[in-house]
């Protein structure tokens, strides 16, 4: 068995990062807004930093729980979420703003919902 308190703490950190992503990306209407100005590039940088933190935390959760936590939630592409962190961290100059924007608009909300379900299931 794993340390439930530690897992809940990490889940809450991920939840906070996802909330920041939603807050910082909800007014973006297309990927060009992330590259067309210095402000957009700063927003892209900030979003990528949050995705790195989320991906790293997901990797830690997977290790701590021996894969059992994510196995109970197959509706999320956990491997893809963790892998996106690797792309951002190791191939930063190859980041595709279109991909970041697509993830913000299509993947963040389902991930957030899954994280909330996990928090509830663990009794927080």
Identify the meaning behind each predicted range.
Residues 1-124:
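Solvent-exposed interaction patches of small proteins and small membrane subunits
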């Amino acid at each position: 068995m794993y340390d439930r308190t530690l897992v809940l703490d990490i889940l809450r950190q991920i939840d906070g990062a996802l909330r920041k992503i939603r807050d910082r990306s909800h007014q973006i209407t297309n990927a060009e807004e992330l590259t067309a100005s210095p402000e957009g590039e700063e927003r892209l940088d900030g979003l990528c930093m949050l995705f790195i933190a989320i991906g790293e935390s997901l990797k830690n959760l997977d290790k701590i729980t021996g894969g059992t936590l994510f196995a109970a939630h197959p509706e999320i592409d956990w491997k893809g979420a963790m892998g996106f962190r690797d792309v951002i961290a190791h191939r930063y100059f190859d980041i595709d703003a279109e991909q970041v924007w697509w993830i913000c608009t299509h993947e963040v909300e389902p991930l957030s919902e899954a994280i909330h379900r996990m928090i509830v299931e663990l009794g927080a």
